Amino acid sequence: MNRDDIAVACLLRHKVDGYKLVVANAHFFWDPAFSDVKLVQAGMLMEELEDLYAKWSVKRKDEPKPSSPTAPDLSGKTALVVCVDMNSTPDSGVYEFLFRGQLGPSHPDFKGHRYGKYTEVGMSHPFSLRSAYAQGPSGAEILPFTNYTPGFSGVIDYIWYGTTGLSVEAVMDGPEAAYIENVVGFPDPHFPSEYIPQPTHTQTFHPSILNLFFLSLFVLSVGY
């Protein structure tokens, strides 16, 4: 099935200490009837990010040195953030794949179709990813929805971060329940999109210097 859904990725570098951040933004097919298409898109995205991450993580000889002589040299450290409108709820195969880092070849979301290695040996990626809005012991998503329309309300948009390089310091609450009770869906005069914003404040860390702020990232995940 030919789709025009896209993903973009960029490499950010902190001027002070050289810490690198790979940020990707992606959009998966919207139709809930095609969970298999979204799985394939997720697999392709993570394969490409794995290649880019490996390429961009290498410390080049011509790479600028940290601008501060007193700052630790973290130019060899790289973190990952993936902002994605998955059009998939937390009980989907796409969510399981990104969260667990692997998915079996016979997962029902493939719908019995054959997709080469994905349905022969399964899918996997090397990143330890967590959803920024899935906090606490249960790991459940704390927002009741990220998309709110008269016909649908649910969590389908996510900010995934690599736990080996980032930790979440704060996230913003969703719309107040009292307000939601009086509207049938978005957009409306106060919310210009059916997707709500998901600002996330993250902290980078180095294994030997925990809790030291090197970078404050304000990510806004917005649906298409």
Language model segments and positions:
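Beta-strand-turn-beta hairpins that frame and shape the catalytic cleft
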Residues: 3-27
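Residues at alpha-helix caps and immediate loop-helix transition turns in enzyme cores, especially N-
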Residues: 34-41, 93-94
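Short glycine/proline-rich turn/loop motifs
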Residues: 25-28, 181-183
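Alpha-helical elements of Rossmann-like donor-binding domains used by nucleotide-donor carbohydrate transfer enzymes
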Residues: 7-9, 40, 44, 97
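Active-site environment of divalent metal-dependent phosphoester hydrolases
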Residues: 30-34, 88-91
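Short interface patches used for recognition in eukaryotic signaling and trafficking proteins
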Residues: 27-33, 81-83
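Alpha-helical scaffold elements lining the catalytic groove of polysaccharide deacetylases
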Residues: 38-49, 168
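Metal-dependent phosphoester-hydrolase catalytic domains
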Residues: 2, 11-13, 52-81, 86-224
